[in-house]
Swiss-Prot record:
One of its GO terms (biological process) is translation. It comes from Geobacillus stearothermophilus (Bacillus stearothermophilus). The keyword Ribosomal protein applies. This is Large ribosomal subunit protein bL32. InterPro entries: Ribosomal_bL32, Ribosomal_bL32_bact, Ribosomal_zn-bd. Pfam families: Ribosomal_L32p (PF01783). One of its GO terms (molecular function) is structural constituent of ribosome. Keywords: Ribonucleoprotein, Ribosomal protein. The gene is rpmF. GO terms for cellular component: large ribosomal subunit. It comes from the Bacteria. Belongs to the bacterial ribosomal protein bL32 family. The keyword Ribosomal protein applies.
């Protein structure tokens, strides 16, 4: 069975793992109420999207 010829250094191991991280969601403030919300989605607090009242109809 094959084994690694050299030990993997801390730096090389960490460089390989730089992409194994959680992505931060794109948060923006609602222009209507100022509440934080996910980008390109309806605001949960006031129910508006792109300046229009979507939920409370």
């Amino acid at each position: 069975m094959a084994v690694p010829f050299r030990r993997t250094s801390k730096t090389r191991k960490r460089l390989r793992r730089t992409h194994f991280k959680l992505q931060v969601p794109g948060m923006v403030q609602c222009p209507n109420c100022g509440e934080w919300k996910l980008a390109h989605r309806v605001c949960k607090a006031c129910g508006t999207y792109k300046g229009r009242d979507v939920v409370n109809k």
